A protein has these predicted regions:
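Peripheral interaction segments used for macromolecular assembly
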Residues: 1-254
């Protein structure tokens, strides 16, 4: 299922033995555009720490208006005893090695796919040891969804709007779309751009470049936050841009 980051922000986080806080934001890598960590706001519990939860530990998402919670398949003690990272420190590879080693999870940077040896999160523990061996590793540069909000979208013939939100797939934790607000050009219009269609990102300039014209983007299927993102809508969107759906690519990869 697809969720926006803004929808998930503030959701309660339920560990196996109790509440650990609420969703603050997400960190994603800029190679595969996949969420690597949920950042928890733990209030007075574990002050001064960045409490990071990998998608390996994320369970079901309850969207019920009276619940709005995400299950975490960890105990509070496991989280408390995990490698600590100060709230003002970046997430280094050294920290990630310690973090993933502590939980004995497969390292996502060991392999060619978004989750190492697979394009999805492998839940079979018996296969994990195999995943941590021998595959080519790569450096991940983690970005914040909070910091990425507001980045300007540059078409091949000028500016077109800014990033309003990120849309996440809770099965693979891939960022499927950037929600682009174009109200400065066409009042009330919001459109979706897939990270697969991005030419490059200038993190210093806070700009996302796409090899599409403003006119092409202008006439793309309109997205509204209230609209349920169905596969039919996604198919229409990909067909408009003459692109193959990611779900077909992943079907082949499996």
């Amino acid at each position: 299922m697809l969720f926006t980051v803004k929808t998930l922000k503030g959701y309660k986080l339920d560990a196996i033995d109790g509440d650990v806080g609420r969703v603050k934001e997400f960190y994603f890598d800029d190679r595969h555009w996949t969420v690597r960590y949920l950042v928890a706001d733990t209030g007075c519990w574990l002050p001064g720490r960045q409490v990071l939860i990998s998608p390996y530990a994320l369970g079901s998402i309850n969207k019920d208006i009276y619940q709005q919670q995400i299950g975490i398949i960890l105990t509070k003690k496991q989280i408390q005893d995990s490698p600590s990272l100060n709230s003002d420190m970046p997430v280094s590879r050294q920290f990630e090695e310690s973090y993933y080693g502590y939980y004995s999870w497969p390292r996502y940077w060991s392999g060619t796919y978004s989750w190492g040896s697979h394009p999805y999160i492998e839940r079979d523990h018996e296969k994990w040891e195999k995943f941590n061996q021998d595959e080519k590793t790569w450096d991940a540069h983690l970005r914040s969804t909070h910091a990425g909000t507001g980045y300007h979208i540059q078409a091949n013939d000028g500016g077109i709007g800014h990033v309003e939100d990120f849309i996440i797939d809770d099965e693979t934790w891939a960022i499927r779309y950037l929600m682009v607000n174009t109200r400065n050009f066409w009042p009330g219009k919001a459109v979706l751009i897939s990270p697969q269609w991005i030419e490059r990102v200038s993190w210093g300039e806070r700009k996302v470049f796409v090899n599409l014209s403003r006119e092409t983007i202008k006439h793309s299927p309109q997205y509204t936050e209230e609209f349920l993102l169905t596969r039919d809508f996604e198919a229409e969107l990909h067909q408009y841009y003459h692109r193959q759906g990611y779900w077909l690519d992943e079907l082949v990869a499996k």
